[in-house]
């Protein structure tokens, strides 16, 4: 029933059952018995047996590479004639014989030879284990996908509809994932043994049903290419059988098949690795699988486009019929299928292909489709120094302008054989000088600008190459031993949009962004087809097509071409003859044959390097590299080493490639800076208290705040250290104080000098005065002035005043008496005013008011919250009399500024479009009245159209124009401006918006206890919200600030404030040189353009249109590197481009009123009434969130709850609700201090206590989160500084007083001096 494999030990245990009998002993014959009916077992038993067998298989796989010693020693050699074995053991004799031979292989000494590893067997075992946990899902009778049991759940893709084909799993209910294509459900416990173990999907190679799967850089490739609809949900396993993911779908990616999968890890966390072009591999119901009738027409007959009649379809057998069929069905939606059918010719027997994957086959069909067109030769201005008609002429070079990749169109076809079939990458199909189509292998195709380019891919006429910047481009190839090259002028300049890293290497990150690139995956849609027109004749030497022997001439016509030349015989006039058959002969006497040309039978692309040809589209061939919007991976530079020094952030490291460093302040003035850094670097960035945002490359922004101002010195030390500290902490206050003190000191010194001078003269006068003034007595009287101490008791002060100063005593007592009189006067007048309320009506009104107060059902809490999501949350403890406290937290979740915008126009890269020159040979031509009818302009939106007629061109030119007149030749040159083909991609298009008013919205989270309520507030009104028994009234927001100006520009994922020109006022080379408002980005019907086109007179060396124009204004604007709002927006706003929003701007505030019902409060039975509060600060570090620790002890009279919070502004305390017990209580809490000295008032219930302490400086002055404590505005002066300043001011004041008294005394004495007259 199950395949059985055993290890060596298991085989030895069962050896008596299989070993032969003793030598010479004949085994008794046992007749063949009928196999008895095996008992029916349940699903659980089957699952248990299957798991046991799987375990044995894994043991065999694990022991495959190990050698074991046979303990039984050497076994005897078996005879060549094998005995009949009893087949009752359920094993075939041949299989058993094979196993015995494997067991008998030994080396010398009885050691078994080491067998070789068998990784293929391990893979088969792992796939087999995955099958046991995989169940098909049926929908309308067909398998639509699969479900897999992994771990404790069953998984299947969400797009797989139907029921699981298992009785226990058919009716389970799945839960759909929100962000990925996955469903999961719990399965019955009885099936736990069948579940596979999960493993983590990493880069590497894994197994699935059809072969191997390679995972690399979030790209999953199916190496087998055999995935198909109906395989969605199949398991992806590693070699041990553990499931790492399930398949969702797939699609072609060039020549590969790329998958979309769901990957798991060991913890069963799922992630989706999606491919944008993948198709879900679910099988539709049988009813939808009916073949659709896809009708193409030919000769009024309808047929399936993918299966035309092979007698008429093959382009190699019947080229005229095939081309006519393609022409008749150009507008059919299934033209692509018809093109593949007529060029691949499915009826013919083909060689066995090397690769059978759908992507490889599809790529081969794309190359073979070029059989519907022919290569061509065109003018090249520089063929190694001279102009020529080249088979690899460069006809078109296209660049997005934002990267180095170029798309080059040449006249030859890459990857195509001479007959138009698919060939190797080095093959090149070209048109030779003889007018025949050739193919060359090993062409050594080279593309070069200033250096050699990397050729990424070459398909048909188009080459995709990554080139360095330059002013010209060269394409070179070796064709049949001859080296050809063509150089043309093309300014290749990369103008990158705003980017943060310039990495050219492999990206190891998972970060992606939208980008524009050339698609390398052909698709069956109109943008992937290009028109071809009638082939133009090329001039050839007459000897290549006509060979004459006397009068007999033979024309050699290459297959599928037309030969045309001028013939003049002796007896006939000159005539133009045409030949279309393979070979023809004519007779002409003295033939003069000139102007030979060959025209290909199949059409080719229109070229501006050739004259204008036919206007009718003959067919369409694949256009391999149209632009598309894709998801590109970007690099993420390693973060630098970040250290803090004083109030600065230091960045140090080494950047291997240029990385952009941007900074901005989070306040009103952003002061944005940006700098490209490469190599070793060390940058110092100052940090402000408002905060700073630092963005390194493509990493997430980092935010830093200055917790306190950095200052050296010590705030609690000697005067010189105090001076150093305060001059750095608050230099304006410190130096002002020093200046005032020095000024006062100078004045005091001057006064002291003057007083000393006066005293000297007074002493001299006293010496000669017999009655000197009472100077000594007056000076002594100053010392008798009574003093008073502020700490004396109040009654002692009153007694002193009564004794020494009756007036002062009266004034001291007058103040309280006056207060009593004022209060009495107010009460008396209040009684007169309220006399009517003292009766029955007054008492009734009083009772009603008291009843209303008692029936109040809610408690109102009001607060104003700053609108900054980066700010710390607001925390408070609600203390309501008679109730236990409640903790309230309010936090701003996000803010949104949404402007009202109007799209004025969009602009993109402008390109000129050139009509091939219309040459009038020996005649005159003129511009049409309606220039839009010119064939190059049809199907495209054009503006700034210029058309000029040039005379006297190409005199006697024998080239492509075929003009033989000297002066009558004229040419019409037409050039217009149009939008680039990249304009259809959102990331390459700039949109000009006018901004009107803005609406500001914020979401505030209110947490009361364990209940969280979200409230949306607005700038233009009050919001009323209800939570769980809460009523919240919030708003309006106090500001309508918006970072957007009146005019903004959006391009890609960035937004710019830019004053763009109005619609219709663009100028060449500036932003808005090409404008449109239509949503049809390929062909807008309201296109305005002015790119400075000027049509010039063509030179006579070749047929061409000469013109000049100005480079795209958008690219020039991007070259100026404007800074987007994501770098310059104030208040730390995050800018969203689509939709246009400003998020998380830290500006404004919102008032809130919260009505809390009585039901939220718990009534107190007893009031704890804390008393005898004492606070001891255990440690304190200022400038740090909750850097201080305090211990509060108190006595509780009753058991209950008390809220603890701070009453000091700017010093937050960790609010909490504490349990109070009767007796001694201790509470440990933390607080934040912005200053070196802190005095904190803490309230516990209704009791207050003061905590005071000196704090140490913080270790770091820069923090990564916004500080909770208040910012220091510059008014802080430490205690020691105040004491020293007070001492200095007091000393100076005393000195001034002494000097003033001395001056007055001396002045008085000198007024009574005597004159001393010398004899």
From Swiss-Prot:
Keywords: Capsid protein, Cleavage on pair of basic residues, Disulfide bond, Fusion of virus membrane with host endosomal membrane, Fusion of virus membrane with host membrane, Glycoprotein, Host cell membrane, Host cytoplasm, Host endoplasmic reticulum, Host Golgi apparatus, Host membrane, Host nucleus, Host-virus interaction, Hydrolase, Ion channel, Ion transport, Lipoprotein, Membrane, Palmitate, Protease, RNA-binding, Serine protease, T=4 icosahedral capsid protein, Transmembrane, Transmembrane helix, Transport, Viral attachment to host cell, Viral attachment to host entry receptor, Viral ion channel, Viral penetration into host cytoplasm, Virion, Virus entry into host cell. Residues 202-212, 238-242 are annotated as: Dimerization of the capsid protein. PROSITE patterns: ALPHAVIRUS_CP. Pfam families: Alpha_E1_glycop, Alpha_E2_glycop, Alpha_E3_glycop, Peptidase_S3. It catalyses: Autocatalytic release of the core protein from the N-terminus of the togavirus structural polyprotein by hydrolysis of a -Trp-|-Ser- bond. This is Structural polyprotein. Residues 282-301 are annotated as: Functions as an uncleaved signal peptide for the precursor of protein E3/E2. Structural polyprotein: Translated from a subgenomic RNA synthesized during togavirus replication. GO terms for molecular function: serine-type endopeptidase activity; structural molecule activity. Structural polyprotein: Specific enzymatic cleavages in vivo yield mature proteins. Capsid protein is auto-cleaved during polyprotein translation, unmasking a signal peptide at the N-terminus of the precursor of E3/E2. The remaining polyprotein is then targeted to the host endoplasmic reticulum, where host signal peptidase cleaves it into pE2, 6K and E1 proteins. pE2 is further processed to mature E3 and E2 by host furin in trans-Golgi vesicle. A motif (Nuclear export signal) lies at residues 164-174. A lipid is attached at residues 783-784 (S-palmitoyl cysteine). It comes from Alphavirus salmon subtype 3 (SAV3). The chain crosses the membrane at residues 734-754, 807-827, 833-853, 1286-1306. Residues 133-281 form the Peptidase S3 domain. Residues 755-791, 828-832, 1307-1319 are cytoplasmic. GO terms for cellular component: host cell cytoplasm; host cell plasma membrane; membrane; T=4 icosahedral viral capsid; virion membrane.
């Amino acid at each position: 029933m199950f395949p059985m494999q055993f290890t060596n030990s298991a085989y030895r245990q069962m050896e008596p059952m299989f070993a032969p009998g003793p030598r010479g002993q004949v085994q008794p014959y046992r007749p063949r018995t009928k196999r008895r009916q095996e008992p029916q077992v349940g699903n659980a038993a089957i699952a248990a047996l299957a798991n046991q067998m799987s375990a044995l298989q894994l043991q065999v796989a694990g022991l495959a590479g190990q050698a074991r010693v046979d303990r039984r020693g050497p076994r005897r050699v078996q005879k060549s004639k094998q005995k009949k074995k009893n087949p009752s053991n359920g094993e075939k004799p041949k299989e058993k014989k094979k196993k015995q031979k494997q067991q008998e292989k030994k080396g010398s000494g009885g050691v078994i030879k080491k067998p070789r590893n068998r990784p293929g067997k391990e893979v088969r075992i792992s796939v087999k284990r995955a099958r046991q946990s995989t169940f098909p899902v049926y929908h309308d009778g067909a398998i639509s996908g699969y479900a897999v049991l992994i771990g404790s759940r069953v998984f299947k893709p969400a797009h797989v509809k139907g029921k699981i084909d298992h009785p226990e799993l058919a009716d389970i209910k799945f839960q759909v994932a929100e962000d990925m294509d996955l469903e999961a459900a719990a399965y019955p416990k009885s099936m736990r043994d069948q579940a596979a173990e999960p493993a983590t999907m990493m880069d590497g190679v894994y197994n699935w049903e059809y072969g191997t799967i390679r995972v690399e850089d979030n790209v999953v490739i199916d190496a087998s290419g055999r995935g198909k609809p109906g395989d969605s949900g199949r398991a992806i396993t590693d070699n041990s059988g553990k499931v790492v993911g399930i398949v969702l779908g797939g699609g072609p990616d060039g020549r590969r098949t790329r998958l979309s999968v769901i990957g798991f890890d060991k913890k069963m966390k799922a992630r989706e690795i999606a491919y944008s072009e993948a198709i879900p591999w679910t099988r539709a119901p049988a009813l939808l699988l009916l073949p659709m009738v896809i009708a193409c027409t030919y000769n009024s007959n309808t047929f399936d486009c993918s299966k035309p009649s092979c007698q008429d379809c093959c382009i190699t057998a019947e080229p005229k019929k095939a081309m006519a069929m393609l022409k008749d069905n150009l507008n059919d939606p299934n033209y692509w299928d018809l093109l593949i059918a007529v060029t691949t010719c499915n009826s013919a027997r083909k060689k066995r292909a090397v690769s059978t994957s759908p992507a490889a086959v599809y790529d081969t069909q794309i190359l073979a489709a070029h059989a519907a067109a022919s290569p061509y030769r065109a003018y090249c201005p520089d063929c190694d120094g001279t102009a020529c008609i080249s088979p690899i002429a460069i006809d078109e070079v296209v660049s997005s302008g934002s990267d180095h990749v170029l798309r080059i169109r040449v006249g030859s076809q890459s990857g195509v054989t001479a007959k138009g079939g698919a060939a190797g990458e080095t093959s090149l199909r070209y048109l030779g000088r003889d007018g025949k189509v050739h193919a060359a292998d090993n062409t050594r195709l080279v593309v070069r600008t200033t250096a050699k380019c990397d050729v990424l891919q070459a398909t048909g006429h188009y080459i995709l190459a990554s080139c360095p910047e330059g002013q010209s481009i060269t394409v070179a190839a070796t064709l049949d031993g001859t080296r050809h090259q063509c150089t043309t002028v093309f300014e290749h300049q990369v103008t990158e949009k705003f980017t943060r890293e310039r990495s050219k290497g492999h990206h190891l990150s998972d970060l992606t962004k939208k980008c524009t690139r050339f698609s390398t995956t052909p698709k069956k849609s109109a943008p992937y087809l290009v028109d071809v027109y009638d082939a133009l004749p090329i001039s050839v030497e007459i000897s290549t097509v006509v060979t004459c022997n006397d009068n007999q001439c033979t024309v050699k016509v290459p297959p599928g071409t037309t030969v045309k030349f001028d013939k003049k015989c002796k007896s006939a006039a000159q005539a133009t003859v045409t030949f279309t058959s393979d070979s023809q002969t004519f007779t002409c006497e003295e033939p003069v044959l000139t102007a030979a040309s060959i025209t290909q039978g199949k059409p080719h692309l229109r070229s501006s390097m050739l004259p204008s040809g036919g206007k009718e589209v003959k067919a369409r061939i694949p256009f391999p590299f149209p632009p598309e919007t894709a998801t590109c991976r970007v690099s993420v530079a390693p973060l630098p080493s970040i250290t803090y020094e004083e109030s600065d952030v230091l960045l140090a490291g080494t950047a291997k490639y240029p990385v952009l460093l941007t900074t901005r302040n989070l306040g009103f003035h952003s002061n944005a800076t940006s700098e490209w850094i490469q190599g070793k670097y060390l940058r110092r960035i100052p940090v402000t208290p408002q905060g700073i945002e630092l963005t390194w490359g493509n990493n997430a922004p980092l935010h830093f705040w200055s917790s306190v101002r950095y200052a050296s010195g010590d705030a609690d030390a000697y005067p010189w250290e105090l001076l150093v500290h305060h001059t750095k902490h608050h230099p304006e206050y410190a130096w002002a104080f020093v200046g005032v003190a020095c000024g006062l000191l100078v004045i005091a010194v001057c006064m002291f000098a003057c007083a000393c001078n006066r005293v000297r003269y007074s002493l001299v006068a006293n010496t000669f005065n017999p009655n000197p003034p009472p100077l000594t007595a007056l000076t002594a009287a100053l010392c008798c002035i009574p003093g008073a101490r502020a700490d004396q008791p109040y009654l002692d002060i009153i007694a002193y005043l009564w004794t020494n100063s009756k007036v002062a005593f009266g004034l001291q007592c007058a103040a309280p008496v006056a207060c009593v009189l004022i209060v009495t006067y107010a009460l008396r007048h209040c009684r007169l005013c309220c006399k009517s309320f003292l009766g029955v009506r007054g008492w009734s009104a009083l009772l009603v008011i008291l009843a209303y107060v008692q029936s109040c059902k809610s408690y109102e809490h009001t607060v104003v919250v700053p609108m900054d999501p980066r700010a710390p949350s607001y925390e408070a403890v609600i203390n309501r009399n008679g109730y236990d406290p409640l903790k309230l937290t309010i936090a701003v979740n996000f803010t949104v500024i949404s402007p009202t915008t109007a799209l004025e126009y969009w602009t993109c890269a402008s390109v000129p479009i050139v009509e091939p020159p219309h040459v009038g040979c020996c005649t005159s031509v003129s511009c049409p009245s309606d220039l839009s009818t010119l064939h190059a302009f049809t199907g495209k939106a054009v503006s700034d159209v210029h058309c000029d007629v040039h005379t006297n061109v190409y005199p006697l030119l024998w080239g492509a124009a075929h003009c033989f007149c000297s002066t009558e030749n004229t040419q019409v040159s037409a050039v217009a401006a149009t939008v680039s083909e990249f304009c259809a991609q959102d990331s390459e298009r700039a949109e000009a918006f006018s901004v009107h008013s803005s609406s500001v919205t914020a979401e505030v989270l209110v947490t009361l206890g364990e209940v969280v309520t979200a409230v949306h507030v607005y700038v233009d009104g009050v919001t009323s919200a209800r939570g769980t028994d809460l009523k919240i009234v919030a708003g309006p927001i106090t500001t309508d600030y918006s970072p957007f100006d009146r005019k903004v520009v959006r391009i890609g994922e960035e937004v710019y404030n830019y004053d763009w020109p109005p619609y219709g006022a663009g100028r060449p080379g500036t932003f808005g040189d090409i404008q449109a408002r239509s949503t049809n980005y390929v062909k807008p019907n309201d296109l305005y353009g002015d790119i400075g086109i000027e049509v010039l007179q063509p030179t006579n060396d070749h047929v061409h249109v000469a013109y000049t124009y100005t480079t795209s204004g958008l690219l020039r604007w991007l070259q100026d590197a404007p800074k987007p709002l994501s770098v310059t927006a104030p208040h730390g706003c995050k800018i969203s481009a689509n939709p246009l929003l400003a998020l998380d701007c830290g500006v404004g505030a919102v008032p809130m009123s919260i009505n809390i019902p009585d039901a939220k409060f718990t009534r107190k039975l007893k009031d704890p009434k804390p008393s005898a509060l004492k606070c001891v600060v255990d440690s304190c570090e200022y400038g740090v969130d909750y850097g201080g620790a305090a211990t509060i002890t108190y006595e509780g009279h009753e058991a209950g709850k008390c809220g603890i919070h701070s009453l000091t502004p700017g010093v937050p305390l960790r609010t909490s609700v504490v349990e109070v017990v009767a007796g001694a209580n201790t509470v440990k809490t933390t607080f934040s201090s912005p200053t070196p000295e802190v005095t904190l008032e803490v309230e516990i219930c209704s009791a207050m206590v003061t905590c005071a302490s000196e704090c140490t400086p913080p270790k770091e002055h820069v923090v990564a989160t916004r500080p909770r404590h208040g910012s220091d505005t510059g008014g802080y002066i430490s205690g020691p500084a105040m004491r020293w300043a007070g001492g200095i001011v007091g000393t100076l004041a005393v000195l001034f007083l002494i000097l003033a008294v001395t001056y007055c005394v001396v002045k008085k004495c000198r007024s009574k001096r005597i004159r001393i007259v010398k004899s």
